[in-house]
């Protein structure tokens, strides 16, 4: 990575609040337990992972003028991410995700308050237009509005845009703009939603990939669960990368780590197939850690993991 290169990440940032009950829950009563506050959000997580991988990562997001907002910016900055271009919205709540889990670890209910993502507007992004257009790569997540995503794709100039679909419900925001996206990282359900083609197994993947490339997408990195990852680009390169055997502790953040790995490899000029394998290593490290973002993530640790990993098929 050249010293002047940097990555711009545009997406969500929120505080995750999780309540863990010590015993079976008694409803309509106060239950003893443990409450954890952790920084989260797809864009923010990707930015932190990029910083851990040695990149200059700038997060463009929105927080409220409340305690959570200040805490979120401080913690994110302490993790190595530049947050000076984040928008602080007076009188608005910082995006938060509140979950309640019983003593077995099962989530019983959750409430999300993410309205502040609507503050990430085309006008806000345009204020940082020149900075965005000088990035080595732009990463966007589909938590932001369709208007904001459209601005990014219309104004990226020659900067490649990597998009995290986030969910089957949110990925439709970019369905008509695949020709403006460099790399898309969907899972099986997101790919089915976008293409309208059923993905029953490995035999359907080439057909789905062809649909994406016919609609102009440059690179597809398709997570197929236990089958591994299928990757293809518009020039014809394609293949399967086997899943890495992992002791799964926490599934939250694995996809964010994978996207960070893909973007980091692009900055470093790594070949496509090697990039996918490296990104899987990043995901494996996230899965094997109790935290959403594994503090031990580094290029050296990922390479070591990938070189010594046991494949599942």
From Swiss-Prot:
Pfam families per UniProt: PfkB (PF00294)
EC number: 2.7.1.83
Keywords recorded for this protein, A-Z: ATP-binding, Kinase, Nucleotide-binding, Transferase
A molecular function (GO) term: ATP binding
CDD domains membership: YeiC_kinase_like (cd01941)
Cystine residue pairs: none
Catalytic activity as recorded in UniProt: pseudouridine + ATP = psi-UMP + ADP + H(+)
Top-level taxonomic group: Bacteria
Record family assignment: Belongs to the carbohydrate kinase PfkB family.
Function summary: Catalyzes the phosphorylation of pseudouridine to pseudouridine 5'-phosphate (PsiMP).
Protein name: Pseudouridine kinase
Organism: Escherichia coli (strain K12)
Lineage: Bacteria, Pseudomonadati, Pseudomonadota, Gammaproteobacteria, Enterobacterales
Gene name per UniProt: psuK
């Amino acid at each position: 990575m050249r010293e002047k290169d940097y990555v711009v990440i545009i997406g969500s940032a929120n505080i995750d609040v999780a309540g863990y009950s010590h015993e079976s829950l008694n409803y309509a009563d106060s239950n003893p337990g443990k409450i954890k506050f952790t920084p989260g959000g797809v864009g923010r997580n990707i930015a932190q992972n990029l910083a851990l991988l040695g990149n200059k990562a700038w997060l463009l997001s929105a927080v409220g003028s409340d305690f959570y907002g200040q805490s979120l910016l401080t913690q994110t900055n302490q993790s190595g991410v530049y947050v000076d271009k984040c928008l602080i919205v007076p009188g608005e709540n910082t995006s938060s995700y509140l979950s309640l889990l019983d003593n077995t670890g099962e989530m019983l209910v959750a409430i999300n308050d993410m309205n502040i993502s609507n503050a990430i507007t085309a006008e806000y992004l345009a204020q940082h237009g020149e900075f965005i257009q000088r990035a080595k790569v732009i990463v966007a997540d589909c938590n932001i509005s369709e208007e904001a995503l459209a601005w990014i794709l219309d104004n990226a100039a020659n900067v490649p845009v990597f998009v995290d679909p986030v969910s089957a419900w949110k990925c439709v925001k970019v369905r008509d703009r695949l020709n403006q996206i460099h790399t898309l990282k969907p899972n099986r359900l997101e790919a089915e939603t976008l293409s309208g083609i059923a993905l029953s197994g490995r035999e359907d993947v080439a057909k789905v990939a062809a649909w994406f490339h016919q609609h102009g997408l440059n690179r597809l990195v398709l997570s197929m669960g236990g089958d591994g990852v299928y990757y293809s680009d518009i020039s014809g390169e394609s293949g399967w990368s086997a899943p890495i055997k992992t002791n799964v502790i926490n599934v939250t953040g694995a996809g964010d780590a994978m996207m960070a790995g893909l973007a980091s490899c692009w900055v470093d000029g790594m070949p496509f197939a090697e990039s996918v394998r490296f990104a899987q290593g990043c995901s494996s490290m996230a899965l094997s850690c109790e935290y959403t973002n594994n503090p031990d993530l580094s290029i050296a640790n990922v390479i070591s993991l990938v070189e010594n990993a046991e494949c599942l098929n």
